[in-house]
Amino acid sequence: LGYDLALLSMGGLQNQSEEQLLERTREVAKIIPVVGFYLQPSVGGRVLTYDFWRELANIENVFAIKMAPFNRYQTLDVVRAVCNSSRRNEIALYTGNDDNIIVDLLTEYEFNINGESVKKQIVGGLLGHWSVWAKTAVQYFEDIKAIRDNAQIDASWLSKAIEVTDANAAFFDPAHAFKGSIAGINEV
């Protein structure tokens, strides 16, 4: 096919059960490695359970998950589910949470899994937001990679995180349930 991985969206499949979505993923993963995709409900996605993400993480040939639920609790469900998987070291996590880009990339998630401390970081972003200022995005990402393992991170990164989220509002139209997202990206 000429592709390395397929980003497999669960969007538009609200009539499918979680088990049907998992079976669909298993079938696609037989053909090509998969990146699971958690898309926020306001733009066609749906809420998926912790159990769904734990099972998805256990599917051979799933190698990454893009998390874009725009919801901290749902993002935590995915990270915790992957950490609970025996395949946790094989699965890369990417943020698609344009409303929390910098914090997602700076955070090291840590969970107690059966008495063991398990840590996981988001390794990158697949973000519509960054499509409008790629040079700055790349610079921020390089800067974040250089500092995120430090014991202390300058507080200015928290201010920068809010500035990026504020800019996100201009692109994605959250005031109108993200209905202007495509037009916003195209305009900017």
PLM features: residue spans?
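Active-site beta->alpha loop and helix N-cap motifs at the rims of alpha/beta catalytic domains
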Residues: 1-53
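Catalytic alpha/beta core domains of metabolic enzymes, predominantly
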Residues: 30, 35, 40-182
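Scaffold signal of the M16-like zinc-metallopeptidase fold and its non-catalytic homologs
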Residues: 182-188
